[in-house]
Amino acid sequence: MNKRAMLGAIGLAFGLMAWPFGASAKEKSMVWNEQWKTPSFVSGSLLKGEDAPEELVYRYLDQEKNTFQLGGQARERLSLIGKQTDELGHTVMRFEQRYRGIPVYGAVLVAHVNDGELSSLSGTLIPNLDKRTLKTEAAISIQQAEMIAKQDVADAVTKERPAAEEGKPTRLVIYPDGETPRLAYEVNVRFLTPVPGNWIYMIDAADGKVLNKWNQMDEAKPGGGQPVAGTSTVGVGRGVLGDQKYINTTYSSYYGYYYLQDNTRGSGIFTYDGRNRTVLPGSLWADGDNQFFASYDAAAVDAHYYAGVVYDYYKNVHGRLSYDGSNAAIRSTVHYGRGYNNAFWNGSQMVYGDGDGQTFLPFSGGIDVVGHELTHAVTDYTAGLVYQNESGAINEAMSDIFGTLVEFYANRNPDWEIGEDIYTPGIAGDALRSMSDPAKYGDPDHYSKRYTGTQDNGGVHTNSGIINKAAYLLSQGGVHYGVSVTGIGRDKMGKIFYRALVYYLTPTSNFSQLRAACVQAAADLYGSTSQEVNSVKQAFNAVGVY
């Protein structure tokens, strides 16, 4: 949640254009990837048949082999990695591109089949790999690649060798490095000290060169921490801003304490005391009388209460059970570190710093902050957006959008500002970002003003302002850069962006792909000729995203 994360990165950028496709432009449309000269979003009545849904996808790609340029049979180039039925009854499948059995990094295709008809394909596949002679055996070992990544972290980030934790297993991938795909190791270096980090490295498997690196802070591995057996009760306490809240707790007759353990939602909501250390998760919060009014309790009261609000929002509005869709437990640690000016999702739990009292109050005191960070978890379990460049900016925008919608859902002094409750307590009216007016805090509100440098992972906290503005306009309407947008309200805006995130976006999606995904999501929900579809187009036109 840094206002500006000053992190260097080299990016993957995709330029796209929209074109009519196939025999009937009225029925089919395409978003074209200018870098790879292949489609990245195709929609319409693509293919009908009685085959299994995945067979329709393979058959269509083979039929359009000159367009997608996969080379060979599609079933030999793609591996089905996920299949589900969405709330509209569509079969949604995710495929990962492979080269001689090796995953192609970020090359994920999402397909929708409804009533025996293939209706859309989204995602960027790398063409003509069969025409390249790519190495499939590494010249350096996994251990060497990991040592190179850890040493680079020490040299460039922490200035000392970090106490690395177990991360995602290192794997070989085909990495689309600019115009030259190559064999690389994907290495994950996670650590909590001296500063938290969750770095992804692409290490050339031939010579150990660092091809790319970025900090995916919303993932890391926590320690233990066990729930208690007991009776569900309701406690009361005061939050960071002094407001009283009733919270679900658990009484353990064995220990004689009340714990911040909510057994009424999914697999539970658990809140821990970090005790100003950097070891996670800390101790499950305990209290002797079920009243949490001490000043030290405030951050825990808010973290616990707001986690429940976020759970309720996703369940009641979108039918989603916890961040993973399968009722995963929600764990939060407060009082992390001393005066720590940050909050982050670490792949398994939420972590909240106390702030320094001047720049930030305790981060759990902002309901939109809690909603923002837990939405990173939703993104991790759905689109898996790479936290760099435009895909990273979409990642951040989704968290801002749904953090704000959670705030409106709870009706707790809602507005279109981000982090206003906990940022610069001595300055009235200040915030981290604004969705209604991104330029208010120096963020771009139009694609022509986007940041194109390498800091902040390629501007993930900056360029998110472009998408935030589009979402605001879609909800509230208005005129922006001479483009008039008819608002459709917060609820419909949220449903469109949620459907785009969960059922259409892929790890390397960019702004143009997001536009196409939102248009298709609106068509799914409200009809292809609806005002909602027109408003989506207007909103993205207004911010210069086509």
UniProtKB/Swiss-Prot annotation:
Cellular component terms per the entry's GO annotation: extracellular region
Pfam families to which the protein is assigned, alphabetical: FTP, PepSY, Peptidase_M4, Peptidase_M4_C
Active-site residues, record numbering mapped to chain: 373, 461
Record-linked CDD domains: M4_TLP
Signal peptide range: 1-25
Chain positions recorded as Zn(2+) binding sites: 372, 376, 396
SUPFAM superfamilies found in the cross-reference section: Metalloproteases ('zincins'), catalytic domain (SSF55486)
Gene3D superfamilies the record matches: 3.10.170.10, 3.10.450.40, 3.10.450.490, Neutral Protease Domain 2
GO molecular function: metal ion binding; metalloendopeptidase activity
Location within or outside the cell: Secreted
GO biological process: proteolysis
Binding-site residues for Ca(2+) 4, renumbered to this chain: 423-424, 427, 430
Primary enzyme class: hydrolase
Cofactor binding note: Binds 4 Ca(2+) ions per subunit.
Residues annotated as binding Ca(2+) 2: 368, 407, 415, 417, 420
Keywords, alphabetical: Calcium, Hydrolase, Metal-binding, Metalloprotease, Protease, Secreted, Signal, Zinc, Zymogen
Protein family according to the UniProt entry: Belongs to the peptidase M4 family.
Function noted in UniProt: Extracellular zinc metalloprotease.
Name this protein carries in UniProt: Thermolysin
Lineage: Bacteria, Bacillati, Bacillota, Bacilli, Bacillales
